[in-house]
Regions:
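Rossmann-fold cofactor-recognition segment
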Residues: 53-68
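Conserved glycine-rich Rossmann-like NAD(P)H-binding loop of the short-chain dehydrogenase/reductase
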Residues: 32-49
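Conserved glycine-rich cofactor-binding loop
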Residues: 18-19
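Active-site loop of short-chain dehydrogenase/reductase
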Residues: 9-10, 84-85, 130-143, 178-182
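C-terminal helical subdomain
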Residues: 178-181, 185, 201-243
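Substrate-binding pocket helix/loop in short-chain dehydrogenase/reductase
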Residues: 99-100, 107-112
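Catalytic loop of short-chain dehydrogenase/reductase
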Residues: 137-164, 170, 174-177
């Protein structure tokens, strides 16, 4: 039976690590012994909320998903600090209410820039280094909205981008497979984060998923050996027929 991948000195990049799911992932992986490169637009907030993490095992770097140049700068800084890259967690994202009756073109453009183009750039820049790892991992945080359009309360723009993210994750799986790279789209339902504040139609607060639960799922995927690939991992907070 194949052993799972131990954290050892494996290096994981996590985008959007200053709040919500990203912060939970950072804290959980740090506790397991991973070396972390944490990216966020608000560097001051990132430094404050991750101050308790081991300083010798954590790099903090600016990553604004709307700024293409931040991608290469972050990758370069990660390699300069740790000398390797073993996993990428695409977590940074936004939710804007864009439907046929609400929102505007600028909001739709922001959704695509942050939720789709930014993780595409990160995967493209990280792939050569993940291939060299021999057991590279890409975990992209999608949504149950990646799998279906639930009802009229859902942001059409958001659902469109989350469907695209699922396609992106599957493409990454094919791109790196022969070199040991495995890609997983982790698809949480309503989670207790600021992202859902004031959004209609979501599961009420007490019934939402704890971000620490998502962090545990990410850690599980990162430890799986190459012969145990998980392409999609939906985690729902409500009863649905196919999710």
């Amino acid at each position: 039976m194949a052993a799972s991948l131990p954290p050892d000195d494996r290096v994981v990049m996590v985008s959007g690590a200053n709040r919500g799911i990203g912060l939970a992932i950072a804290r959980h992986l740090a506790g397991l012994g991973y070396r972390l490169s944490l990216g966020a637009r608000d560097e001051a907030m990132l430094a404050e909320v991750t101050a308790g993490l081991p300083p010798d095992r954590v790099l903090r770097h600016r990553f604004d998903a709307m700024v293409p140049a931040d991608t290469d700068a972050w990758i370069t800084a990660t390699l300069a600090r740790f000398g390797r890259l073993d996993a990428l967690v695409n977590n940074a994202g936004v939710l804007r209410q864009v439907t046929f009756d609400e929102g505007d073109e600028a909001m739709l453009d922001e959704l695509w820039a942050v939720n789709v183009k930014a993780p595409f750039r990160l995967i493209r820049a990280a792939l050569p280094h993940l291939r060299r790892s021999g057991a590279g991992r890409i975990v992209t945080i999608g949504s149950t909205d990646s799998k279906r359009y639930r009802d009229g309360t859902v942001s059409i723009g958001y659902a469109m981008t989350k469907h695209a993210v699922l396609a992106l994750s599957h493409a990454a799986k094919f791109a790196g497979w022969d070199d040991g790279v495995r890609a997983t789209a982790l698809l949480p339902g309503a989670t207790r984060t600021d992202l859902l504040r004031g959004i209609p139609g979501v599961v009420p607060g007490p019934g939402r998923i704890d971000p620490d639960t998502i962090a545990s799922a990410v850690a599980f995927v990162l430890t799986l050996p190459n012969e145990a690939a998980v392409a999609e991992l939906p985690i729902n907070a409500r009863l649905e027929s196919t999710l």
